[in-house]
């Protein structure tokens, strides 16, 4: 993935938080009003507290004071503090509606791009999920902390500086400004020092997670090779490296906090000495000194808040950068993917050729190679110069040795990969057709039967959500699933089914779609012999269907209209069972070997 600088990331995040509707713009205006009013009421409450202290001093010293005035100041202080708290809390609650919209839009867009860019990007599902989860969490933090915490803190600082100047003059404002500037400079320097650990910590964390995931995924291999202790030791070494980096980072954070606290402690002592001297000279009252102390402590709290956000912003932006780079990479892959040039949403159906001798599927000098990657520096050619025609209504079997490219042929028809050469489905050139329209006219079962960990009903109806219940039951029966439905029910989840039962669910889903073209990749390989023959007989009796099957069992070829034999990515033989047996070539040898 390409990287981007921090300013670009910040601009992208700001654009994501931009209001997208009048209601959201009004909500942002209310949030801004909450920020302004909340901090203004906070500063006013500090001044009111000084008046209360002055009144209490008069009671103790002279014994005469307007008690009702003190009560009024106390009531005003209570109202101001309550309003300040109410507005301060309201802004975060209101802004959460914006952050929720941003995260939802980001996640939906990533999922949409991932589905369109599948097989064009190298990222693994687990890695993609980790980046999206971390990135969305950190985007929320950046937006919330920046707009509802950092912005109010800056506004509060401006109000406090103004009030210090108005009430106490430059004599006190200058040292406060100098300390704030030193605080900011020191924080920036320490953040630069801390930044050197940031990337190493992320890399070490990812390395540990990847090591655990790979060990769990390949646990049988680890045990078979007696490498349990080796893997544990290797993981321990990587974790020691990670903890050392995190310890250094914590030390840097500790030094940052220590320096920040020391600066404002010195300022507070300086202000206290000057304030006490002014109070002794009757240039300042006790209440004024209390207000000044409160201002200094409030400035310290605001600077501490900003420093904390700046301290964590680097880590947050790292995950945000990963998510934005992932988004851009998926967008490029989707633009280069199958059917990217076609207006997928604007084409209602896949154009078809006039009836007659038009082919349902036609390959013309088609080649395909998996793209180069870090794992595979040399592109692996899977198909080379493949040409054949499958007529409408034909039942065709594709056979060959493992790795010969049989499954890839079906995947290319489904527009799951880019290819060289021409592929036509019902007379339509794939690259000028809508992927949605082409796939909508095809019922398919891919290798290893992809299913969701949901109910039988959910998986059977997947892609056909409006199918009637009676149709669902009928296709479950046709797929041999009736006994499973009676025993376990339609709401049983996939993990409660065996491999053969899962394959029946895939068959029922394909039958329910009732598409004119069916692509079946070893769709009955896990069924028992009786069920397999029943399902195969049902498919052979389907009228008006073009069926293309990748076969694992050669007994079926005798009942098909034609057989395509693929070897090493090229078509070696094409014909009926009897024709290929007469050639006494590869098909004859495979058939003879299967009977022995």
Curated annotation (Swiss-Prot):
Q: How does it sit in the membrane?
A: Multi-pass membrane protein
Under Gene Ontology molecular function, one entry of this record is:
ABC-type transporter activity
Say which family it is in: Belongs to the ABC transporter superfamily. ABCB family. Heavy Metal importer (TC 3.A.1.210) subfamily.
Is Phosphoprotein included in the keywords of this UniProt record? Answer: no
**Highest rank taxon of the organism:** Eukaryota
Q: Where in the cell is it found?
A: Membrane
Membrane spanning residue stretches = 26-46, 173-193, 289-309
Task: Answer whether the UniProt record assigns the keyword Acetylation to this protein.
Answer: no
InterPro entries given in the database record: AAA+_ATPase (IPR003593), ABC1_TM_dom (IPR011527), ABC1_TM_sf (IPR036640), ABC_transporter-like_ATP-bd (IPR003439), ABC_transporter-like_CS (IPR017871), P-loop_NTPase (IPR027417), Type_1_exporter (IPR039421)
Q: Which PANTHER family match?
A: ATP-BINDING CASSETTE SUB-FAMILY B (PTHR24221), ATP-BINDING CASSETTE SUB-FAMILY B MEMBER 6 (PTHR24221:SF654)
Tell me the protein's name.
Probable ABC transporter ECU01_0200/ECU01_1410
GO CC aspect terms: membrane
Q: Where ATP is bound, by residue?
A: 370, 400-411
Q: Name the source organism.
A: Encephalitozoon cuniculi (strain GB-M1)
